Amino acid sequence: MKKSLLTLSLLSSLSLYGCGGSSDYSGGRGDMPNGELTLSITDAAVDNASEVWVQFSAIEIKPESGPSITHVFDTPMRINLLSLQGSLSQDFFNNLSVPSGVYNWVRLAVDTDGVADSYIIMNDGMHELTIPSGSKSGLKISNGFIVGANSQTAVTIDFDLRKSVVMSSGQYKLKPVLRLVNNDEAGALNGSIDAALTTGANCSDQDPKTGNAVYVFAGHDASVDDIDKISPDPVTTALMSLNVQTGNYDYEVGFLPAGNYTVAYTCMADLDDPEVDDAILFQSVTNAAVDAPVELAGADFNR
């Protein structure tokens, strides 16, 4: 079975934890007491997929000083990332006792052995997911975070599928674009889109179920563009769903660091290839401000 963390890396880590287990750090690192860490995952969805399952076998975190710490799951966690949109998330572990202090990065071990451990379900059926660089290096998030002494810290990984799922040589590949957010420093953004905008002349098609998404860019009055790994790229994106009571389409973006944002709506998101500079049109653009923690900001799009 292929894993995105080498066995050697796991064995050389400072300590191994089983799922639901507790740590050995009764006295913390040096004279510092422990803190409790909760690590979760959320997702920004992608068009034309009904399910995206990724199987995680371990989590590795790296203190600023000293060797890394690895949490190995007794049973690998297989998660449908498409079920974690908006402000929804799933814990990898909850209130795990770890040494307090600064941590430099997080690495995810993902199973991709080609036997339906990690896969995507598209309109034409199920396809295995491969991770080009994951067999040796894992999925690494270089954002740092701090675990406070004798306190609880919660951070969430945004696994942005719209930026991460690419088709290459007939295979679906994960080239993950991951960001790490401290929950206490993050809020959420929601709004609605007039149904008439979802079937306009500039849309990719006349089906309101495809291509409709909001892209969120850092700062007010920011330039907006497609996803192509060239600035400006959105911080994150969100799909929308029909509100049967209003007849409009609603969206929610969770785990956004507090600050100012430019929110852009497009009905051409299904044409956005993250590997290519596409001519995506944005039908409406507005500014929004997000407060923390977990304060909902609004940004609506009307005809």
Each model region followed by its residue ranges:
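Positively charged n-region of N-terminal signal peptides that target proteins for export
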Residues: 1-4
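Hydrophobic helical h-region of N-terminal Sec-dependent signal peptides
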Residues: 6, 10-12
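C-terminal motif of bacterial Sec signal peptides marking the signal peptidase cleavage site
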Residues: 15-18
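A short, solvent-exposed, low-complexity linear motif enriched for acidic/polar residues
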Residues: 20-258, 262-303
